[in-house]
From Swiss-Prot:
Description of how the protein assembles with itself and partners: Part of the 50S ribosomal subunit.
Similarity annotation: Belongs to the universal ribosomal protein uL22 family.
Function of the protein: This protein binds specifically to 23S rRNA. It makes multiple contacts with different domains of the 23S rRNA in the assembled 50S subunit and ribosome.
Protein's name according to its UniProt entry: Large ribosomal subunit protein uL22
This protein's UniProt keywords: Ribonucleoprotein, Ribosomal protein, RNA-binding, rRNA-binding
Organism: Saccharolobus solfataricus (strain ATCC 35092 / DSM 1617 / JCM 11322 / P2)
Entry's Gene Ontology BP terms: cytoplasmic translation
NCBIfam families: PRK04223.1, uL22_arch_euk
GO CC term, one of those recorded: cytosolic large ribosomal subunit
InterPro entries (alphabetical): Ribosomal_uL22, Ribosomal_uL22_CS, Ribosomal_uL22_euk/arc, Ribosomal_uL22_sf
Length: 157
């Protein structure tokens, strides 16, 4: 496996909690927009927002990879963008890594109500190549793309 490190942040190690999930079977395109939307939010606010998107009460704005994304009327005006979607599979994976980071924070003795998402990012993971049989003895390559999600929570006063 390739070497990998968390980004270096100028914060006290006793005030942060980290979590990572690797080789998630999810597209980097959806994860990028989910991570961008919740970066800098309080942990509880981010989880509430993601649950509202899962219930399709609010759309997630798509800044990048938004070709074909229609304008949604239930996007908040604070995003200053109209294109949005409901990437449910990506949100479930991000909620999973947020729960893991929250458990790490409580294990460290940090106050959960004061946690903000200091860093969250999705990176490309491994790509699995498979073959789909076709007519006349041919085969077509199929690619299964994966992603890695990393999160750092910081306790603020």
């Amino acid at each position: 496996m390739a070497s990998w490190k968390y980004p270096q942040l100028d914060v006290d190690e006793l005030k942060i909690a980290k979590a990572v999930i690797r080789d998630v079977p999810e597209s980097i395109r959806d994860l990028y927009n989910v991570c961008k939307a919740i970066r800098g939010m309080y942990l509880n606010d981010a989880k509430d927002f993601l649950n509202r998107v899962l219930e399709e009460k609010e759309a997630l704005p798509f800044w990048r990879y938004n070709k074909g994304a229609s304008h949604k009327s239930n996007i908040s005006a604070k995003w200053k963008i109209k294109a949005g979607r409901y990437p449910k599979k990506a949100i479930r994976q991000v909620l999973k890594v947020l729960e893991n980071a929250e458990a790490n924070a409580t294990n460290k003795g940090l106050d959960v109500d004061k946690l903000i998402i200091r860093h969250i990012a999705a990176h490309k993971g491994i790509t699995l190549q498979r073959y789909m049989p076709r007519a006349f003895g041919r085969a077509t390559a199929k690619y299964r793309r994966t992603s890695n999600i990393e999160v750092i929570l910081e306790e603020v006063e």
